Amino acid sequence: MKKTRQSNVELLRLLAMFMVLLLHAVQSFQWPRGGFLMSQPLLVHLGFSFVEMISVVAVNVFVLISGWFGIRPTMRGLGKFLYQCVFCCLVVDAVLWAVGAENLSFSMLFEAFTLRQTGWFVPSYLLLFLLSPVLNAYVETADEQTQRRVLISLFVAQSVGAFVLKIFADFNYGYSLLSFACLYLLAQYVRRFQLQRLARLRSSFFLLIFFGVALLHTLVGSIALFGFGSKVFQQIILYSSPLVVVQALALLLYFTRQTLSSTLVNRIAAGSFAVYLIHQHPGARPFYASICQKAFMDAPPAPGAAALLLWLCVVYLVCVGVDELRRASWELLLSRRKAEKS
């Protein structure tokens, strides 16, 4: 039986992918090292910093959502995920070839079918998908005390050992299966054992934590940037930062408290992963970055910011539209397979 999607969480999934667009838009200016932004007024600097601080949670939020509901791995689910990745890569390759920006070659097709055009996230999430039966079995059998101790140990290792002391390379600053597994187990633990206790808190409390951490990061990061350089600034907003993890969890808890039912939200959110796959394709990334720069730099800050947001919305809608084609082709393949079996 097909599960009904919870629109409140699907809205968060949709928002998280827009945060990815925002984050990469900010990074297209080589922030915080870029000379253009450093020459702008303080208000522009603080604005870009704050946008980065609220957007950096996107990856953690995406993984936490998977942990909240639990991944139920099936061959069909795996096939659907891989098909989406390959389809989006091939669409970008086809467009690049059509406009003369890329030559059609065996190596291009090989990279598309082996997921080499999907960046670091897809391989890590694919490994999480494959490992999920083990994680699910653990959370279903281990008691609350055991899970709490394991989580404390893992996050101390990540926060202190990897983030501060940098002695556990396997966490890779949050860009790894190990960090994904920690987030997955955290979401499962909170949903299974802490919801009753957290129910005493208002939903606005979690939103306050989210924006409060973002504001704190903005202020501390700005002081670090101008006082100690961009390297320190970048260290405080790694995915493995304990405050970034808390910020992401707070945002998830806020949205789980909301009530929403929307077929449109569910539909758009279902295709939102295509946004990442398409705009982060190695061939599309420079084009995306150049338009982000042009949109903001060719106008005063306020109109430039509006133009930049409009561009991000266009990218989002185009990518979701491409995923609708992917969805239709996937359903066509399934229907033909059923017809052949009957």
Regions found by a protein language model. Name each.
Residues 1-157, 201, 258-267, 271-274, ...:
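Membrane-cytosol interface segments of multi-pass membrane proteins
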Residues 161, 178, 196-274, 280-290, ...:
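Alpha-helical transmembrane segments and terminal signal-anchor/GPI-anchor hydrophobic tails
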Residues 46-59, 109-124, 164-183, 217-248, ...:
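Interfacial loop-to-helix transition and helix-capping segments at the boundaries
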Residues 69-70, 190, 253, 275:
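Short alpha-helical scaffold segments that flank and stabilize functional sites
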Residues 128-137, 184-196, 245-260:
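Alpha-helical transmembrane segments in multipass membrane proteins, preferentially the mid-helix core
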Residues 147-194:
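Loop-centered beta-sheet repeat module
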